[in-house]
């Protein structure tokens, strides 16, 4: 199914920003669709923006609507395996997500990025670089704007971040280039295991002209041999990698230097990889990357991702709230340069993760670890230099008297936020406010 042929009744599951974008898009179609919305929340966000002709059922599921639908457009947070969707699926009703609707409508080239970690940075950076090269580019998907809202920008290139959840309900998205950055344990409360999770991610390559894969993570390679691959890694390579010349490390293509690593606006080894991917994606999409190097030099990253939010008396406060899994926190720890002690804040909702992978990195650092939230206690056995707190506020109140010149306070929780916060952004904003408060205290 790649269009609305034969469709009359459409049920949208889940409102919010994405759900509203779906409703608006459906009502713009010439087929005069009848659109209904189901949201299990009593007062769904965005309900006041629904047009009068769109009926809303809130507070519970509405099975009759689902069984009568010709098409169901579901929120990425709802698994296809859920008992509520299964009766309609077994009946043969198509169930898609907003990215599939985007695929039906888009006419300009599209680039997509997925992976366990780094995808937001790569997506944002790729968009910035493309715009700098003179290509009118729209960026969104799992970051910023909902994909369907991007269509209103009438861009010449679309750059999408796609989560595994979004890819589950996407089957016809044609891409000029797609990148699978890395694979590490995440969302084990949703998937049966790592291979199930990997297969969801690999769907990004289904209709991609070029597949960007990680030489240091073979799990990112497609299972079939009929794909055009371009790889990136930290080694010397005929593709995208690193070389050393005159004692300096350079990002390179075909063993030819592109830009020195110490000229990048982003810091940390993982951001060398992120920059290589952005270059590979744009090159595959036909964008002149020579015009993008100044952007690589000035781009300093996303809010909530290893972002210095306050600095006073030699103490830096770093907001890495977007580190919602173990691999993200490991990446943050591997790129650190600290004169004094690291005060690390971890915890939240662990999503079934194995936190023991953090132990080797923790052992290498002079630190105190403050464990808070629903699964904070699970971090305590990892290191004897740990303290258990109920909340992040309590943790910062505890550590603030101990701060000295050269120390760093870092929120890199390795967990989701929804036990105590609406989302990772709200958690990061709360940390930033606390950082500024304690940095200015007399």
UniProtKB/Swiss-Prot annotation:
Keyword Cytoplasm found: yes
One GO cellular component assignment for this chain's record is:
cytoplasm
**Which pathway does the protein contribute to?**
Cell wall biogenesis; peptidoglycan biosynthesis
> In which residues is ATP bound?
115-121
Q: Where does the UniProt entry say this protein principally localizes?
A: cytoplasm
Q: Where can this protein be found? A: Cytoplasm
Which GO molecular function, any one, fits this protein according to its record?
UDP-N-acetylmuramoylalanine-D-glutamate ligase activity
UniProt keywords (A-Z) are: ATP-binding, Cell cycle, Cell division, Cell shape, Cell wall biogenesis/degradation, Cytoplasm, Ligase, Nucleotide-binding, Peptidoglycan synthesis
Q: Pfam families from the entry?
A: Mur_ligase_C (PF02875), Mur_ligase_M (PF08245), MurD-like_N (PF21799)
Provide the protein name: UDP-N-acetylmuramoylalanine--D-glutamate ligase
Tell me what organism the protein belongs to.
Aliivibrio salmonicida (strain LFI1238)
Per the UniProt record, the lineage of the source organism begins with:
Bacteria, Pseudomonadati, Pseudomonadota, Gammaproteobacteria, Vibrionales
